[in-house]
């Protein structure tokens, strides 16, 4: 809700506090401080409670954000406007209430008074000290940048410094290591055009990220040539479901290992092929596509093959490099198999969950079994998926237990409502034996300021399924979200479902 004071509106635009001239409609300023939150106007001052639980008082001034006081109040999420009455500010978090009395002349620390957290002692901190002491700062920056063999700059096994050099009034960074719908400010080195953001990651981590310039421009890291494609991140680092593709920069820490199964198969290695089919669905009255991977040797064999139904399959084919993984792993660590890439409900087509499951069970599975030499038993069928495709896989597996008894899911996107739909379908391992592989990233999709965390949802579901006796392998991996992450473990998914000799 906006507030008005002396010809100007003050409000949040996305996550940024903004001042707008009512006469011209021009934005006078934007500020990342004090963080996303809720504001009221009291006696010419903005009183703001942030979602992280801090209380701020700033002048309502069109020249810029000028904080006069702050107080860290709550450790849990706050999601309501402050109130003011009888000289006191009243605020609440999800679990607590507080009254803050306003007193003239009270000394309350401001953001500017707090010491800025510096990077840990090391090469980069020494560089910062050198720049601070130098008369000719540009020369010190030039030498440091020229001495680097790669960017971002990694110190030791865990410390990483993201750098941006160029003209900007404000720079920020967003990505897997930070979470959805938020960025972290980058610090300008005074007297230079170099900005930095320092953090610690696991020594074998891989994360995707973007830079944000002057609140509007999304930038790849111009110093880092590693890029990836993802449909998980929308504008302003919003979570999106199979949305528009976005290019991201990515970083690997020193102990991360490139998955060789993603490489193009070597010359001479037998390769499978992908066939496409257009299926008319009588259940929802539309035509949809499926793609089917057929392993090398299928045409000269009389064998029947296990089948994986990969939900949200078009993304897996386009960005998940599944065909490379299949060609490289089959007959080595993975049994020869058929993979069906399902593409229902992509784009603007919304398919109710019950209809989706029915299409899979009553139309797709019978079509595949009648078209290809599948092994048509539950133990030879698997559901798999990543992100929202993981929820589709989970739903189909538990809704139709007679059709499949294996499942592999990555980064399950399932909130409380989704879990309420799944839990009534779940029986026990005695009633419905099911082999389950689950994984999620340490830096997976989450929004701390909105109180949701897909990592925690996955942990809770894994524990719940284990409690009901299911065979669950659950892994938390040092990676982020989207296909830049998931594809790195195509091998783990395949080997969890149908390893060589699975049916011996």
Where are the regions a protein language model picked out?
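Short beta-strand segments
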Residues: 27, 69, 98, 171, ...
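Non-catalytic cap/lid and distal C-terminal segments of serine-dependent acyl enzymes
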Residues: 115-182, 189-504
């Amino acid at each position: 809700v906006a507030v008005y004071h002396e010809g100007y509106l003050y409000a949040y635009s996305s996550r940024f506090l903004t001042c707008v001239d009512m006469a011209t409609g021009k934005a006078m300023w934007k500020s990342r401080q004090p963080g996303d939150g809720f504001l009221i106007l009291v006696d010419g001052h903005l009183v703001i409670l942030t979602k992280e639980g801090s209380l701020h008082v700033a002048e309502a001034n069109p020249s810029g954000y000028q904080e006069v006081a702050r107080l860290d109040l709550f450790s849990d999420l706050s999601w309501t406007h402050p109130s003011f009455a009888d000289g006191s500010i009243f605020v609440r978090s999800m679990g607590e209430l507080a009254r803050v009395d306003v007193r003239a002349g009270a000394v309350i620390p401001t953001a500017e008074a707090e010491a800025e957290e510096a990077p840990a002692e090391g090469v980069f901190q020494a560089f910062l000290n050198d720049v601070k002491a130098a008369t000719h700062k540009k020369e010190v920056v030039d030498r440091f940048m020229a001495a680097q063999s790669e960017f971002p700059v990694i110190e030791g096994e865990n410390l990483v410094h993201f750098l941006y050099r160029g003209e900007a009034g404000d720079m920020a960074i967003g990505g897997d290591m930070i979470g959805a719908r938020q960025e972290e400010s980058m610090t300008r080195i005074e007297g230079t055009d170099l900005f930095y953001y320092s953090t610690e990651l696991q020594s074998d981590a891989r994360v995707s990220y973007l830079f944000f310039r002057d609140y509007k421009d999304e930038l790849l890291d111009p110093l880092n040539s590693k890029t990836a494609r993802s449909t998980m991140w929308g504008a302003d680092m919003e979570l999106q479901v199979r949305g528009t593709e976005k290019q991201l920069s990515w970083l690997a820490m020193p102990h991360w290992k490139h998955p060789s199964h993603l490489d193009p198969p070597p010359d001479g290695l037998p390769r499978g092929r992908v066939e496409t089919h257009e299926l008319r669905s009588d259940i929802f009255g539309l035509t949809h596509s499926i793609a089917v991977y057929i392993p090398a040797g299928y045409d000269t064999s009389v064998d029947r093959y296990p089948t994986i139904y990969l939900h949200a399959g078009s993304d897996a084919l386009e960005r998940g490099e599944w065909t490379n993984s299949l060609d490289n792993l089959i007959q080595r660590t993975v049994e020869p198999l058929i993979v069906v890439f399902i593409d229902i409900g992509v784009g603007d087509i919304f398919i109710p969950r019950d209809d989706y499951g029915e299409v899979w069970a009553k139309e797709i599975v019978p079509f595949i079994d009648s078209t290809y030499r599948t092994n048509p038993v539950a133990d030879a069928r698997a559901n798999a998926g990543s992100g929202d495709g993981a929820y589709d896989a989970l739903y189909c597996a538990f809704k139709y237990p007679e059709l499949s008894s294996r499942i592999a899911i990555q980064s399950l996107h399932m909130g409380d409502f989704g879990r309420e739909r799944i839990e009534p379908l779940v029986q026990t391992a005695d009633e419905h034996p099911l082999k389950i592989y689950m994984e999620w990233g340490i830096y997976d999709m989450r929004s701390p300021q909105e109180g949701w965390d897909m990592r925690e949802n996955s942990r809770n579901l894994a524990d719940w399924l284990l409690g009901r006796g299911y065979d669950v392998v659950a892994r938390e991996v040092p990676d982020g979200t989207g296909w830049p992450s998931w594809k790195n473990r195509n091998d783990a998914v395949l080997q969890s479902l149908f390893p060589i000799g699975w049916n011996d």
